[in-house]
């Protein structure tokens, strides 16, 4: 670092020289010390394993700017995976990990995070030109808003991963702001023009303050933006659109897919399909079973569906009762970098739209796994809703079947099998009934 400070060598030149010597464990925190002009507010962040935190790490990687991060200890509700730091450790100046309450949306946990961020920021208030906050976890936008109030010149970029105020089933999310003074002070701050938008729902307030005061607003797709604006008047819609940027989740480079070697075994002569992800109310084991069912009924037997998910009694009960379990292998969810490596072993990766027909006017979601799948050597088999963002995506290696066009599952699979030059049927795979 002394050589850099004296101007004898640039940081990039020094890193390149160290790498040329075969040095892999470079202490980037020392090289980056004091360089961050951007502050990232991410309540949940690596090394704690969470989709939102991982995407934030990928945003930092994509942006290529050195940053400081203020996050929170999440050990009570999230597992730790130290390898996740490999995504962006080379761009980290410092990370302050707070010890506030840990919760998805409790007001106590939000207050603790705000207080911790304000305390940390005041020690380095002249350091930053920009801050970036990302939701999910509403804590991040609340803290960013408080910093914006005390430093209006700092650029605030606020990202929304999904619609915030309603969930995938269009149920209202509600978590009370348990501080009447905060609500009244906020109403006074926004003024009479917007005070009616402020209530005691932290999810609503989180969205409103970001819409009004962030300098840039990041959405993952146009339908998400349009859906979130439906409840606002034309003035706010125009304000938000003037600051909106559409940006799908970043994809990591190929070397990240080789960082952890998986020793998972697949039969090379079979067509190996994989599903990675949690099961939810609108996406569960039934979708996997239907793929196996309609392939089997089309006289296709040379395939295995490898499922990596949050195994629990309910899921395993469905699996054990399935007539098609011979074609499905259940596995516990894999750590992030092993998951990336596993994708390369497969012939196709399954991805499903959230089902929103009859629930929402259009589908405002893009499955987060798509960005990781794009970097894999494998093909992607997407099961879509009509006219969703995923349904309208055209890419090499992407095969699309509408979720409820069950009779087309086999034809899409046969096209995939033909493209990878594997048989769809083998006599040795015939299952004899007991």
Region locations from a protein language model:
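A short, active-site helix/loop in glycosyltransferases that binds the activated sugar's phosphate group
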Residues: 75, 197-243
């Amino acid at each position: 670092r002394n050589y850099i400070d004296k101007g004898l060598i640039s940081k990039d030149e020094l890193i390149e020289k160290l790498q040329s010597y075969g040095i892999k464990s470079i202490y980037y925190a020392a090289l980056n010390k004091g360089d961050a002009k951007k502050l990232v507010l991410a309540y949940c962040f690596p090394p704690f394993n969470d989709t939102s935190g991982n995407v934030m790490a990928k945003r930092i990687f994509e942006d290529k700017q050195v940053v400081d991060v203020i996050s929170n200890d999440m050990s009570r509700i999230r597992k730790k995976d130290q390898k996740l730091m490999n995504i962006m450790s080379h761009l980290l100046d410092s990370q302050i990990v707070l010890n506030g309450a840990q919760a998805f949306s409790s007001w106590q946990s939000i207050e603790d995070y705000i207080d911790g961020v304000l305390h940390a920021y005041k020690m380095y208030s002249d350091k930053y030109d920009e801050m970036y906050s990302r939701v999910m976890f509403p804590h991040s936008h609340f803290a960013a808003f408080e910093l914006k109030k005390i430093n209006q010149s700092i650029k605030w970029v606020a990202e929304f991963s999904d619609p915030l105020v309603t969930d995938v089933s269009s149920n209202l999310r509600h978590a009370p702001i348990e501080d009447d003074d905060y609500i009244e002070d906020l109403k006074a701050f926004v003024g009479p023009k917007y005070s009616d938008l402020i209530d005691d729902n932290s999810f609503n307030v989180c969205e409103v303050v970001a819409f009004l005061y962030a300098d840039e607003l990041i959405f993952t797709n146009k339908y998400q933006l349009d859906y979130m604006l439906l409840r606002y008047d034309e003035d706010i819609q125009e304000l938000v659109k003037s600051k909106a940027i559409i940006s799908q989740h970043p994809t990591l480079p190929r070397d990240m897919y080789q960082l952890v070697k998986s020793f998972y075994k697949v039969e090379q002569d079979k067509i190996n399909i994989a599903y990675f992800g949690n099961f939810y109310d609108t996406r569960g084991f039934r979708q996997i079973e239907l793929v196996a069912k309609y392939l089997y009924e089309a006289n296709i037997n040379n395939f295995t569906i490898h499922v990596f998910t949050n195994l629990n009694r309910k899921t395993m009960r469905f699996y054990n009762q399935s007539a098609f379990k011979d074609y499905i292998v259940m596995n516990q969810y894999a750590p992030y970098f092993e998951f990336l490596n596993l994708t390369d072993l497969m012939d196709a990766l399954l991805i499903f739209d959230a089902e929103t027909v009859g629930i929402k006017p259009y589908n405002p979601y893009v499955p987060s796994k798509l960005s990781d799948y794009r970097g894999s050597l494998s093909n992607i088999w997407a099961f879509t809703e009509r006219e969703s963002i995923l349904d309208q995506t055209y890419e090499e290696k992407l095969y699309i079947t509408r979720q409820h066009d069950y009779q087309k599952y086999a034809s899409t699979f046969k096209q995939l099998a033909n493209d990878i030059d594997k048989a769809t049927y083998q006599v040795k795979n015939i299952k004899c009934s007991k």
